[in-house]
């Protein structure tokens, strides 16, 4: 009996290792460099999975790579009640992704000599004054850009500020003399007021309203013809309706908002228009190249916030992965823009719900793009063997049933006194070895996505695997552990002599 058990264990290990080696060899063979139809299907599956998990009514998603649009598509509904589907022309409130436009505008004005980044804010906003430890402190434009001014993140949360002051000048007057959280330039603290003040500086320097300046000098030249700024809660034909979750149900939401927050939060745009913005960021014309590169450079370290990334001019950065990105959240909208200038691609996700699944979706799409050769190869190979995987599922299901029948029969025998328990050091050692084998198999299976595909987990991989492969994997896993249970029963029981 021991020989048979060891033989079965050896065969199980050999099969598992052989499968892993075969997949590994396949993945390291030559692959096509272009994104295939399988990749498109994988991306659709990933997107639909994350939108469903987040209960997101609608989203528009843009992927630009090497100057070409790989994906620009709507998912779900921009208006659930009227059954209006989301599309590339659907306009969303992009929240804090407005800041990159404000930051770039400030850098352009500095390049033109109309202001200096080291200028005191009070030079361009004469009435502006704030204190630290009771003493007046000078805040510079650069510190506003870097989010190191010391202005509290919650400075505009009081009703006295948010409800009664709806213009940039008014709100800056309302906070005059307030206390800073930190001495300017010393610590990072994210605050919308930093970029609202930059918007006011743009107005005072250019003698135009913030919205008009951005429209004339950035939106029109970039052919972002349909991009606007929020003025009311009225929704036009192409505007997405915003939603908030009640339980797991999205309900229409029209929260109050403040016009003075426009430079930091209230641009309204679509993936169709943002296509021009992303291409500009990744491959700017020569006359703008140094300006765009400057806007991506770190201005501050976010040491004040654990696990945060450095901040540039309206962008967070991740130097290790060469990423430039920013999220945007309102009560009823969320957005995320990610750029990888080194590998020349960008991802945009706009959604009509504030959801943690928006950044998760961007992370999944980013991983998909970085590893698309491997994913395309895996998908194309697995799809060729769907019938074989169905056979595996049937065989594994049969094995599971046999293991269940044997275990049930062994339990019946034990209840009727037909078998005895074995106790010996040798049995204990074999049991521990079996348990260790069980744990080893579990760890190998858990780590397979990382070992084969790189920096992924099963929950992500399962979103794009075909159902035939999922069933084969699940039944194989259950069959392996069922077999281990049978082995343990063989080791620990013996039939009594009659």
Curated annotation (Swiss-Prot):
User: From what superkingdom does this record's organism come?
Assistant: Bacteria
Q: Quick one: where is this thing mainly located?
A: membrane
> Where is the protein localized?
Cell membrane
Instruction: List the InterPro entries hit by this protein, alphabetically.
Output: Bact_CellWall_Synth/Modif, Beta-lactam-related, Beta-lactam/transpept-like
> Which residue ranges run through the membrane?
6-26, 389-409, 433-453, 471-491
- CC terms in the record's Gene Ontology section: plasma membrane
Q: Would the keyword Secreted turn up in this protein's UniProt record?
A: no
Q: Which UniProt keywords apply?
A: Cell membrane, Membrane, Transmembrane, Transmembrane helix
**What S-S linkages are listed for this chain?**
none
Membrane topology, as annotated: Multi-pass membrane protein
Query: Which function does this protein serve?
Result: Its precise function is unknown. Has no penicillin-binding activity and is not involved in methicillin resistance.
Q: What else is known?
A: Has two of three conserved motifs typically found in penicillin-binding proteins (PBPs) and beta-lactamases, but no penicillin-binding activity has been detected.
Q: What is this protein called?
A: Protein flp
Protein species of origin: Staphylococcus aureus (strain MW2)
Q: Which gene encodes it?
A: flp
